[in-house]
Amino acid sequence: VPEDVTVIVSRLMSIFTNAPYDEIYNDACEFYSELAQGGFISYSDEYVEWSRDSYFSYANNALVELPKVETDDFAYDDVFGEIQQLTRVQVDVSGYCNEKCVHCYIPQSCKHGLMSIDLFTRILEQCRDNNVLNITISGGEPMINPDLTEFLNLCGKNNFSVNLLSNLTLLSDEILRVLVANPLISVQTSLYSMNEDIHDSITGLQGSFKKTIQAIRLLHRHNIPIQINCPIMKQNKDDYSDVITWAQSMNIEADSDYMLFGCYDCSKKNLKCRLSLSEVEAVVTSQCESGAYVDKLFTEASNK
């Protein structure tokens, strides 16, 4: 929701009581201009009636050219001093999951329990006291928790940006309304293949492909920022790139990775699907032969 900078400055005046108004105002304008240049906020000299379409739109979405920073020009201690700033906290609000992904690092015996509103509220209070900026809500599957919409609303009331990690198979109209109403919420999901049988064989849930695809299209229609992850494993190594191509056709951010890790009970039972060294070599070789992949690497390198 848009807010006039003078209103923000008035609140800052009650904190920085010894600083003159003009100094705080100029510093605030400079700070918000830098955030706007980085794509973190929308900032204008004129009042604009907010709508999600004007804040973020897949039709108008384009890569933001961030200013190049040389390593020698930036040192963490020079900027933040000796105080180590915590900026992001991940909160797993559900131990349960309706999928049984073959590569999941959470042992099946550990998939239980739901977080209460009281505990979530106390976590947010501590995050606010420590100037945390982003809350990542995950699980298990967070949409199994019946209090998810309340969690999201609490994050909104406390001005946290939110990254919601979900398989999206349980997306409801109630949850969708909350996502649409808050421009600070983005969604991250996994799509393993454009082949329904392959995707469902990985998730262990029949019909999960159709539900996830349908939910992605619905979020896309409402201009809710989505990121698609596509882990590469034995089951999808020959067609994972179709997921990336499909996502790019809709201007959705997507990425793939062949790194899989064992369960956190130190077992390796989920690693049967991990690529062998020769399969990793084949995947990397194929990617390097792709002009689009090489262009992406050059772009990422130039922005570092």
For each predicted feature, which ranges?
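Hydrophobic positions in alpha-helices of CheY-like receiver
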Residues: 12, 127, 151, 155, ...
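Long, charge-rich, low-complexity alpha-helical segments
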Residues: 1-87
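Flexible, glycine- and charge-enriched loops at secondary-structure boundaries
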Residues: 21, 110-117, 205-209
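Alpha-helix N-cap/loop-to-helix initiation residues
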Residues: 17, 144-145, 172, 208, ...
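Radical SAM enzyme [4Fe-4S]-AdoMet core and its adjacent flexible, acidic
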Residues: 190-192, 197-304
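Conserved alpha-helical substructure of the radical SAM core
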Residues: 34, 40, 59-186
